[in-house]
Amino acid sequence: MSSPVVTRFAPSPTGFLHIGGARTALFNWLYARRFGGRMLLRIEDTDRERSTQGAIDAILDGMRWLGLDWDGEVIYQFARAERHREVAESLLASGNAYHCYASAEELAQMRETARAEGRAPRYDGRWRDRDPSEAPEGVKPVIRLRAPSEGETVVEDAVQGRVTWANRDLDDLVLLRSDGTPTYMLAVVVDDHDMGVTQVIRGDDHLTNAARQSQIYRALGWDVPAMAHIPLIHGADGAKLSKRHGALGVEEYRDRGYLPAALRNYLVRLGWSHGDQEVFSTEEMIAAFDLKAIGRSAARFDFTKLESLNGLYIRGSADSVLVDAIDAILPARGPERGLPTALTPDLREKLVSAMPGLKERAKTLVELLDSAYYLYAPRPLALDAKAEALLAGDAPERLRALLPALEALPDWNAATTEAAVRQFADSQGVKLGQVAQPLRAALTGRATSPPVFDVLAVLGRDEALARLRDRLPA
């Protein structure tokens, strides 16, 4: 009987959860859920100078926002250093590792010689078979793996296929530094083994690490987990992903108004495909996810596609859900718009009422918030240039003439206000747009908005009439 599937996401807390890390987490999560397994979360915080609590918090918050839950407690690699040392000592005792006393100067000379000879730098194994009695006094050694020097190391990768390295090109890597701290290579192997990881899914920049880690596994007599090294993400221009392309923290996507479901959907299609299907519910993703369907070429990040997909998710979301999502980004986006960091009950009610008309065009929650400007703008409304143009000439006098027809309405809703405005336009012998366009400008301060009669209904009688009076000449 095969072992239950266990995957892991293992970020280093030296910065935010970037988009590549988020996709790796998603792929691990989907694979575990697809096979009824577990996804574990390990924080690789052994770089004490660069690891920060703020980065750890950002990673955890980013994963929660994306809806990627992990199983069990978060595992911190640094806290397991004693276990890593114990394993290094066991390799020493079994003869699969040895003490190396090479000085920094000797190692630098090895690198210099390799460069001069046009080959990759590698440790030359000078302490591999030397008698420990030759060790220089007062020098603390490192512990190196006694790696195989002949033959090949092979990784059967679910994405990259069969990958082979000549062992002569893989030197005896350091397992334990002279100060007793474990290296990344050792810590990853020990942690993955102790956590019961059966499937490693990570970026293909770790492919060479897979060969070295396989050697450590075999030296310990442990099973090597299955491997899948996924292609990196590039910008739309094919260059390595940078901040200008979208290499931002997940929290930045949240604050820019992307929905977590839309970002999940976009990320799953970066490098993975299922026929020509573009839109996936979470359940569909889980059911369809297959490592064999991941391509080897770098995926290209395209903001236009992400925005289009986000707009699709906005249009398909319940109005109250969108208002809650807007509320969540107000701490980041509210103050610059003169809004509080949380919705008032009155504004929440107006947003829910206006949402059917607002969400049809918006591609992000920020666009949605800006298109709702008329709901929260203080009076008298600041007009944009196009609105000013619509309210020039005889437009104010036309609005003055319209006002009594609106004031006389016994019931105030989209249908009654539309009927009144249409009747007024007919009585004046003008087209509806000649009334509706300046009316929209006066009510919203903009030339574009949701349907103007919906705007009248959402604002309510008192606010709508007050805004019209603001635009009448004295």
Swiss-Prot record:
Keywords: Aminoacyl-tRNA synthetase, ATP-binding, Cytoplasm, Ligase, Nucleotide-binding, Protein biosynthesis
Keyword Aminoacyl-tRNA synthetase recorded: yes
Location(s), subcellular: Cytoplasm
Gene Ontology cellular-component annotations: cytosol
Family annotation (InterPro entries): aa-tRNA-synth_I_cd-bd, aa-tRNA-synth_I_codon-bd_sub2, aa-tRNA-synth_I_CS, aa_tRNA-synth_I_cd-bd_sf, Glu-tRNA-ligase_bac/mito, Glu/Gln-tRNA-synth, Glu/Gln-tRNA-synth_Ib_cat-dom, GluQ/Sye
Protein residues bound to ATP: 243
Top EC class of this enzyme: ligase
Compositionally biased spans, kind Basic and acidic residues: 113-133
Motif extent ('KMSKS' region): 240-244
Job of this protein: Catalyzes the attachment of glutamate to tRNA(Glu) in a two-step reaction: glutamate is first activated by ATP to form Glu-AMP and then transferred to the acceptor end of tRNA(Glu).
Name of the protein this chain belongs to: Glutamate--tRNA ligase 1
Species of provenance: Methylorubrum extorquens (strain PA1) (Methylobacterium extorquens)
